């Protein structure tokens, strides 16, 4: 087990130009290239454990991969997706498993998707039920509730599906399944979730529309590719920095009263809600738009300062990955901060509500836990040894917390899932030391 020791840090002013590239877009680049009519090029594909598992699975399914420096050339299989000779290991990647499940449900062949102990404990009925309803032959443990998932490609039907949760993974799985039908399909969700799938597929030539509904929900309407026997157009783009990864250094600015400039960050509105929360707490945040191809990209400047408590209970899907890091700001804010409607946190890589509250208490902060959230009373962070709970976002969030007081993080290897050079960047702010314990 790796133990990471973090030393207390001083205020600073710094640009960060090496933030990990976006995990969501990297996953989709590898998967969507399988459907392309010609080779695709992607610069800056995230070389984290999650996205490498997705890339390896795409290779097993027939994707050719050539690398030159930071550019990957992704060559689609000449005769369509291949049936693999082995079980497809998604590692810790819930996005990879759920998107591949949607894609492979309509592909001829037999496919088995598995993951590590954490992924195989995460809920899968949210995709197995709607996919089965449109003709997919998909089976999993405990009445299709958990992976491993066994999929036999079938003839899928168009659909008009109303989801009860806002989940980009569920939506994307259904869209990938629906692309393999002849006709129009509709997917509804109660709040717009991350829409990278829609943006990228639109750029690849899919006729896909997003609309806000009268009840505040969103629907996606699109045409299956079998209607016109159409193949997707190739893509060529550079993956921007991941706003979820950049956010840790925004929190660092708030912890230390520092100023940071985060370079070339994805600015999709469904991904920067946590920065908006920092603004409402008293931090100064500025956005500088630089480019727009499939997605808006730009720089984000954050100036830390005195923070006030806040209540977070809406647009949770837009900041679900950042809530553990936000909790560090809550711990230093004046007053009582609250999070509600965030039950989804309990079924991520760890129970992130329980993990966050446990570690904050160890660091001397008064907290209360709810079924769907938690509250934090602002105070003073104290030096402590905390657990990552095997969750990369918990590990990085509390590494940032320890900038205020120093401390240690157990089982920090999980950081490599999404941000392999996080500790290298952190060492530009303070002393970081790794040690192994048996």
Swiss-Prot record:
CDD domains: EPSP_synthase
Involved pathway(s): Metabolic intermediate biosynthesis; chorismate biosynthesis; chorismate from D-erythrose 4-phosphate and phosphoenolpyruvate: step 6/7
Top-level taxonomy: Bacteria, Pseudomonadati, Campylobacterota, Epsilonproteobacteria, Campylobacterales
InterPro entries referenced in this protein's UniProt entry, alphabetically: Enolpyruvate_Tfrase_dom, Enolpyruvate_Tfrase_sf, EPSP_synthase, EPSP_synthase_CS, RNA3'P_cycl/enolpyr_Trfase_a/b
Name of the protein described by the UniProt record: 3-phosphoshikimate 1-carboxyvinyltransferase
Position of the signal peptide: none
NCBIfam families according to UniProt: aroA
UniProt: phosphoenolpyruvate binding residues: 23, 94, 122, 169, 352, 393
Active site: 321 (proton acceptor)
Reaction(s) this enzyme catalyzes, per UniProt: 3-phosphoshikimate + phosphoenolpyruvate = 5-O-(1-carboxyvinyl)-3-phosphoshikimate + phosphate
Pfam families associated with the record: EPSP_synthase (PF00275)
Gene label: aroA
CC annotations in GO: cytoplasm
Entries under Gene3D superfamilies matching the protein: Enolpyruvate transferase domain
């Amino acid at each position: 087990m790796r133990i990471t020791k973090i030393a207390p840090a001083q205020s600073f002013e710094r640009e960060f130009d090496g933030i990990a590239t976006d995990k969501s877009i990297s996953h989709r680049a590898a998967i969507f290239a399988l459907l392309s009519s010609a080779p695709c090029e992607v610069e800056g594909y995230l070389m984290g454990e999650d996205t490498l598992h997705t890339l390896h699975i795409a290779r097993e399914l027939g994707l050719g991969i050539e690398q030159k420096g930071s550019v990957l050339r992704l060559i689609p299989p000449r005769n369509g997706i291949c049936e693999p000779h082995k079980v497809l290991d998604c590692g810790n990647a819930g996005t990879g498993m759920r998107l591949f499940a949607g894609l492979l449900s309509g592909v001829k062949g037999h496919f088995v998707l598995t993951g590590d102990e954490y992924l195989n404990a995460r809920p899968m009925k949210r995709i197995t039920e709607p996919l089965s309803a449109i003709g997919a032959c998909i089976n999993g443990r405990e009445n299709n509730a958990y992976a491993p998932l066994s999929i036999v490609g079938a003839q899928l039907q168009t659909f008009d599906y109303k989801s009860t949760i806002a989940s980009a993974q569920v939506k994307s799985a259904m869209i990938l399944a629906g692309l393999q039908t002849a006709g129009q399909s509709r997917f509804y969700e109660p709040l717009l979730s991350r829409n990278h799938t829609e943006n990228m597929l639109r750029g690849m030539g899919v006729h896909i529309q997003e609309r806000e509904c009268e009840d505040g929900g969103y629907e996606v309407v699109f045409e299956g590719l079998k209607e016109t026997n159409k193949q997707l157009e190739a893509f060529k783009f550079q993956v921007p920095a991941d706003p979820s990864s950049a956010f840790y250094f925004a929190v660092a600015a708030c912890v230390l009263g520092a100023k940071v400039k985060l370079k070339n960050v994805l600015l999709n509105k469904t991904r920067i809600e946590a920065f908006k929360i920092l603004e409402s707490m008293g931090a100064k945040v500025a956005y500088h738009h630089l480019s727009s191809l499939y997605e808006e990209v730009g720089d984000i400047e954050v100036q830390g300062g005195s923070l006030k408590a806040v209540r977070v209970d809406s647009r949770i899907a837009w900041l679900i990955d950042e809530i553990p890091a936000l909790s560090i700001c809550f711990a230093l804010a004046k007053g009582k901060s609250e999070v509600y409607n965030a039950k989804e946190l309990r079924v991520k890589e760890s129970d992130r509500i329980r993990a966050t509250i446990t570690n904050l208490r160890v660091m001397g902060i008064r907290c209360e836990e709810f079924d769907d959230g938690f509250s934090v009373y602002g105070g003073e962070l104290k030096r402590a040894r905390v657990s990552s709970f095997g969750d990369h976002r918990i590990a990085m969030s509390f590494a940032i917390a320890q900038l205020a007081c120093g401390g240690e993080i157990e089982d920090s290897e999980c950081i490599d899932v999404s941000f392999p050079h996080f500790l290298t960047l952190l060492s530009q702010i303070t002393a970081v030391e790794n040690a192994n314990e048996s």
